[in-house]
Regions:
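Loop segments that connect adjacent transmembrane helices in multi-pass transporters
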Residues: 135-138, 211-259, 331-336, 349-351
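ABC-type nucleotide-binding domain
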Residues: 353-617
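Cytosolic ends of transmembrane helices, especially the final helix of ABC transmembrane type-1 domains
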Residues: 215, 238, 262, 309-339
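Transmembrane helix-loop-helix hairpins at lipid-water interfaces of multipass membrane proteins
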Residues: 39-96, 177-184, 280, 293-297
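Hydrophobic alpha-helical transmembrane segments of ABC transporter permease domains
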Residues: 40, 44, 52, 56, ...
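Hydrophobic alpha-helical segments in the permease module
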Residues: 86-97, 191-199, 264-278, 284, ...
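Juxtamembrane helix-loop junctions of ABC transporter transmembrane domains
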Residues: 2, 13-21, 52-61, 65, ...
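Membrane-integrated ABC transporters
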Residues: 1-53, 68-86, 100-109, 122, ...
């Protein structure tokens, strides 16, 4: 039975997620898609259970009246049928509670937030690189986890508090009116007083909750940032500095917690005073009516029981409302991140890219970063012929990496077009575009998975033999075979650590090269692809790279000019403009920037001049 309910709500829907709206209620409504029927069912059962509980007091009052007017011998015979009916109602309530519990806990409690995490995660995977340039990875993760749980808890609390308590309050007011309309007065006054207290405290708790959620995300982000860059922290002996950096975030989080607890304490004191007044007022009025013959003993017992129950309910409501608006604050904070519009999206008419020849054309391309008014490119024109191998050269900030990022459509151009085989990349799908381009970067990050998983990232359907062949061609198989970990795993089954931290820089770069060899895309981009390799390994890999580049369109970037001197054509960029182009010998004879850079080489690396610009964005 449990498993039947657990399978009612699909946890991992296959349809593409849609960015939810930014409004609070519209965001929550969008989150309930696929689960609304089940949420309605727990709302109905919650209302029915609340009405049932109110009816129990009426039954209890009648039983007390029967006890006061009948002898023990008469009681069973006179009221047996009614008591049997009461017993049947009590037994039937167990079925109602079972349904409510199964839907709440088996259908929704785990499946619903997991479904939201899945959808939010897919939305964040589709976000543009510019989004992650301004966000902590840990902060984004925290908001995905927190917001999913907060939406679930806010819905559950709304059902329990708003619907359940409203049904209960209506039930006991109607019951009190059936006894004597005057018995409604203390209950109604308590409801008004409690409503006023909620109106004062709850919005303030919600505002604090929003600040607290943001402070928690900032604290988590700073701590995660330190762990993710632990090598840099250790290298510069900044453990104390990082601790202080995290402490400031922790202090800010603690301040929001202190503000929250002050409000909670005041709310609890006010709530206790209201509960005391309710108990005294309701009990006193019931006893007064009994003393004047206007109410029976059963009515007095029922009213006192209702007042006691409402008093205990009020404490529960207070904590639920406090947590509800803390969750509201968490959701509002999550909305700011999870509903951001992607800066790079597929066009409505986007089609898969078809690469037949590999010609690349930059046609009057203009581009500037969002946070910089200065244009990186202003009318760049460059044609790369099918199968041509070009090398990009330039000082830092010349635009080399930006040109590659635009080709990969990590950013959209501000003007002009980039075409591959005549197809505007703005009108092809991003997945098909990047599937057609293999790239090795100098900053090689590996996934915290096995060596096999990282290699097969290049082509998941590759065979074991193809994977091992690619490793051998990249001069990686020898060190992979020697790998061992503390779990007894070896070779391709060893986990490489977060970002590949268990491997040296050269080993990571060889894995990245093997991965691109396995991908075997028609366009190849090499951004300092061999910068972390020693000369002996580089010479060995260069032969494999030459074989890999055969028949492909290649763009190579390297500060070590000897690495790209043999390319078909060298393009020299300076301040976003093409200032020289030609073969190695032609550019040396021209005596321009390339010749000067070649002359400044020291140990095979590019010596930056004093006029070199800031690091490329």
């Amino acid at each position: 039975m449990y498993s039947w309910f657990e399978r009612r709500l699909p946890t991992f829907p296959l349809e593409d997620p849609v960015t939810p709206p930014r409004g609070f209620f519209s965001f929550v409504w969008a989150c309930t898609k696929g689960a609304r029927g089940w949420i309605l069912l727990i709302a109905l059962t919650s209302a029915a259970l609340a009405a049932y509980e109110a009816a129990l007091f009426a039954m209890m009052g009648r039983v007390v009246d029967w006890l006061s007017s009948a002898t023990p011998a008469e009681f069973g015979g006179r009221h047996f049928g009614t008591l049997a009916g009461f017993a049947a109602i009590l037994a039937g309530s167990a079925l109602l509670i079972a349904l409510h519990t199964m839907v709440k806990h088996q259908v929704l409690a785990i499946n619903f937030p997991m479904r939201l995490r899945w959808l939010f995660h897919r939305l964040m995977l589709d976000q543009s690189l510019s989004f992650y340039a301004n966000e902590f990875a840990g902060r984004v993760t925290t908001k995905i986890m927190q917001t999913a749980l907060a939406v679930r808890d806010a819905l559950f609390m709304s059902v329990d508090v708003v619907i359940g308590v409203a049904a209960y309050l209506i039930g006991i007011l109607a019951l009190a009116a059936s006894f004597d309309w005057r018995l409604m007065i203390p209950l109604a006054l308590w409801a008004l007083g409690y409503g006023a207290a909620c109106a004062f405290f709850v919005p303030r708790l919600g505002a604090v909750g929003s600040r607290q959620a943001d402070a928690r995300a900032l604290m988590t982000g700073r701590i995660t940032d330190a762990y993710s860059n632990i090598t840099t922290v250790k290298l510069f002996s900044h453990t104390r500095r990082e601790a202080d950096h995290a402490r400031r975030a922790m202090e800010a989080f603690k301040a929001t917690g202190d503000a929250q607890m002050r409000l909670v304490s005041a709310f609890e004191i006010v709530n206790h005073l209201l509960s005391t007044l309710l108990l005294v007022g309701a009990s006193g009025l019931a006893l007064y009516l009994w003393m004047h013959g206007r109410a029976s003993a059963g009515v007095v017992a029922a009213v006192i029981a209702m007042a006691l129950r409402l008093s205990s309910y009020s404490h529960w409501i207070m904590w639920e409302m406090t947590e509800l608006f803390e969750n509201v604050g968490t959701i509002q904070d999550g909305i700011n991140t999870l509903t951001k519009v992607r800066s790079v999206v597929d066009a409505p008419d986007a089609r898969p890219l078809a690469v037949n020849r590999g010609e690349i054309v930059f046609d009057n391309v203009r581009f500037a970063h969002e946070d910089n008014d200065r244009a990186v490119f202003d009318g760049l024109n460059l044609t790369i012929r099918p199968g041509e191998r070009i090398g990009l050269i330039g000082r830092s900030g010349a635009g080399k990496s930006t040109l590659v990022n635009l080709l990969l459509r990590f950013y959209d151009v501000g003007g002009g077009t980039i075409r591959i085989d005549g197809q505007d990349i703005a009108h092809v799908t991003q997945d098909s575009l990047r599937s057609a381009i293999g790239m090795v970067t100098q900053d090689t990050s590996l996934l915290h998975r096995t060596m096999r998983d990282n290699l097969l990232y290049g082509r998941p359907d590759a065979t074991e033999r193809e994977m091992q062949d690619a490793s051998a061609r990249a001069e990686a198989s020898e060190f992979i075979d020697r790998l061992r970990d503390r779990h007894g795993r070896s070779g391709y089954d060893v986990e490489v650590g977060e970002r590949g931290v268990k491997l040296s820089g050269g080993q990571r770069q060889r894995v990245a090269i093997a991965r691109v060899m396995l991908k075997d895309a028609p366009i190849l981009v090499l951004d300092e692809a061999t910068s972390a390799l020693d000369s002996e390994v580089e010479v060995a890999i260069q032969r494999s790279l030459d074989s890999l580049m055969s028949g492909k369109t290649v763009i190579a970037i390297a500060h070590r000019l000897s690495t790209i001197a043999a390319m078909d054509r060298l393009i020299v960029l300076d301040e976003g403009r093409i200032v020289e182009e030609g073969t190695h010998q032609q550019l040396l004879q021209a005596g321009g920037i390339y010749a000067a850079l070649w002359a400044h080489q020291s140990g095979g690396f590019l010596g930056e001049t004093a006029e070199a610009e800031g690091a490329e964005q």
